[in-house]
Amino acid sequence: MFPTGDSAGREGTVNNMPAGFRLQFLQSRLKKRSVSTGSANRTPKFCQASGNPLLPPYLCGRKFLSMISRRNIRVKVMQTLYAQSSLDSATPLSNSVAHLQKHYEQTRQLLVFLLWTLTEIGRQVEKHALQKASKHLPTEADLQINTKLAGNEILWEIQQDTTLADHLKKDQGARHGMENLIKEIHAHLLESPTYQQYIAQPSRTRSEEKKMLLQILNDQMIEFEPYVEWVEDHFTNWEDDAEAILQLLTQYLQKPGKLSGQKEGVSFQQLIPADKWNFGKELLTTVIEKNEHLLSLIVPKLKNWDPERIASLDMILMKMGLAELLYFETIPPKVTLNEYIDLAKEYSTAQSGQFVNGILDNIHKELAEAGQLKKIEFRKS
């Protein structure tokens, strides 16, 4: 995460939370869409509704039309503008766009890392069995370690994805020093009743192979605190991108081996398609190029507030919201206002949502009355 501040300029980071709280915070965000089974204390491990029974509960009912939403893009633009605000104001526009591209690149790197973790857990199953069998005096149990997961056909297809292999060659930083953590995840997996049931079945079905990998993803990876801490330490975008990444990863496991974007496959372009990239770039460049005009509309509404003492994120969000109201004619004003109120509540201070809402709503009403908002009538498709 990036720093946040209040009106007095005090700043901190979400990563300063205790590790256990960070884990609970992330899980509450990811699982807020869990499917109800009619009982307050029963939550299915996978969706039972028609369409895709293999999805984890927090993804039930979601459509995989676009992995990254405009909200995700707004967050990345916000982060880019925040980073720029702490640098020389004369930062070239091209540098800001390149910085935004780095945020997109982090999203891709996170997806690659999660896929790599899955394959490494499979490899650890085989390594563990070989180590046991290679003991000087192996026991009968040492010689009969079940390696079914190592032969999981989905894992094999992932490892044969040449596009993924190319990305793995470029993204090696977060993987250094992971050996012990992979062993911990593997040890945790061995104690799982679901895993014991999986290896007890001598036969294989593609459905069960997929289901086992999704169980590992949910129960042994994103719910394992040491792993989440590792991801947080190496990927500052984890909390912002986790849900979208897990959507794409879940979809990829339905048709593995096609991250190159082949027909009916899953591509990295689906994660951040061209229209989302263009939206982010246009929003970023508009806020930078129209900065003085945006400030001329915002500052008079601050009344008793000193612009220098307003939380920097609040000012950034107000400029972004106003830029959307003025220059993005296909986005309904209500959508813009609601989005930036939510972002202010989540990323800035406790009072920021109300503050940003008051300023933007005031400006919106004046612009609408003056006929300065050029919006295309919004129609639901």
Where are these regions (language model features)?
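Compositionally biased, low-complexity intrinsically disordered regions
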Residues: D6-G12, L30
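Alpha-helix boundary/capping motif
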Residues: N16-M17, K32, G38
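Intrinsically disordered, low-complexity proline-rich regions
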Residues: T13, S34, S50-C60
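Cationic, amphipathic, low-complexity segments that mediate targeting or membrane/lipid association
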Residues: S39-P44, P57
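Class I Rossmann-like S-adenosyl-L-methionine
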Residues: R62-S381
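Cationic, low-complexity basic patches in intrinsically disordered or flexible, solvent-exposed regions
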Residues: F25-S28, R33, F46, F64
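Low-complexity, glycine/proline/serine-enriched flexible coil segments
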Residues: F2, V14-A19
